[in-house]
Amino acid sequence: GLPSQVTKHAFEVGKTVATTPGAVVFRNELLELIQYKPMSEKQYARPLLVVPPQINKYYIFDLSPSNSFVQFALKNGLQVFMISWRNPDVRHREWGLSSYVEAVEEAMNVCRAITGSRDVNLMGACAGGLTIAALQGHLQAKRQLRRIASATYLVSLLDSQLDSPATLFADEQTLEAAKRRSYQQGVLDGRDMARVFAWMRPNDLIWNYWVNNYLLGGNRRFILS
């Protein structure tokens, strides 16, 4: 196993993370849509829909009151909507990019209906960015791209031909093995994915915790995951 990076029980959604007031206003098979309570006297008419990575949680944008993109946006007059992805299991092995695109399109239309705005601003992070890029292509094909006023991408690799750390693990045999395992299990286990990301930056994400928390005794609750 690998050394743990955090104490798992130190965080609780709604108390120590994701504390910004909001409510689920829409739900479909793949996601929930959260609308946050305004934090400014006036708000812009056009809403912002944030699409997090499918392999992460929505509260990466709302870690704490002092470290929250959501609160920053709200205090600057934006109407913020956030997607919270469902954790898939073996029943959802057939979900593909088109499934996620259709789910985001539904959520986007709910944002428009709630706010009365003809269009929305989109922000996608990592795989969420790939999803909104595909959504834009889908809408362009239907001649409905005007429903999106702007799109912002955070660490979204749109050209897979470019070299990146991920290509170290992306030879044809490895990809085929990953596909077979994912289909057999129904999903790619999050722990397996975490190991891949950790070995991309071993000094920061593996040996740092091994040395400081175990060898130097910085964390007596040190465990291997």
Segments from the language model and where they lie:
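Alpha/beta-hydrolase-fold enzymes
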Residues: 117, 131, 136-225
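Alpha/beta-hydrolase fold nucleophile elbow
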Residues: 111-127
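Active-site proximal loops enriched in glycine and acidic residues that flank catalytic Cys/His/Asp
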Residues: 37, 52-53, 84-87, 104, ...
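Short, surface-exposed "cap/lid" segments of acyl-processing enzymes
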Residues: 2-89
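Amphipathic alpha-helical segments in well-structured domains
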Residues: 66, 70, 97-104, 132
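Secondary-structure capping and boundary motifs in well-ordered enzyme cores
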Residues: 25, 41, 65, 96-100, ...
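Alpha/beta-hydrolase active-site loop
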Residues: 92-115
